[in-house]
Amino acid sequence: LFHRPTGIHRDVGILYLVSSLETILQLKGEKALFLDVSTGELGASLAYALRGKKNIRAVLVYPKGTVTGLSDEDFYWNGGNIYPIEVDGTIEDCNKLCRSIFDDENFVKPNRLTLANTVNIGRLLPQAFFYPFAFSRIKNKVHSDIVYALAAGNYSNVVAGLYAWQFALPLNGFVIPSHQALAADVMGNPLILDSIVPVKERDDTDSAHVSNLERLEDIFSANQL
């Protein structure tokens, strides 16, 4: 996964998302705008993916003095469709700013704002192909159960892996850290605290703090979307 343009796994999902969205927008004669908080990896990957794209722009918000991985060349190559905004504050200040913008539907819809993080299904689905690729590399070298160990993060990788499993990929499970929102009972079944509240009765998805717990609920039929 590090054999990508910027050397990070995010390139896989972001390149697919940007290319697909650019094609759709071109066919419809429309434009769209990414609004994301980034201090490095996401911004660098998005800047590379947007090179030469005519129908998509990106606003990257970051705390002053923290951004890495972006250079002047990124903006030259992109012909003016990357807009970096430096905020004199913390990463949480940046998140609050973006959250307040996405809360305003009257602004979001006419400007066709979207996100490049894994709340966007177009970014998440390509990650499902990580696991068949890994399986193709190890299937003849392993003669026992195959279990993937993953960092928790926002659970995007385990959701993508479970999608691959639902697509009939033969594997035996995932090992991920638990916390108060996601644990397991004595039988190993997932316990998702949020599942006691129907999805339609919850607050809107937080654009600043992406969580894929609702997708996990749907996979395990804890709370149908």
How would you describe each model-predicted region?
Residues 1-225:
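PLP-dependent amino-acid enzyme catalytic core
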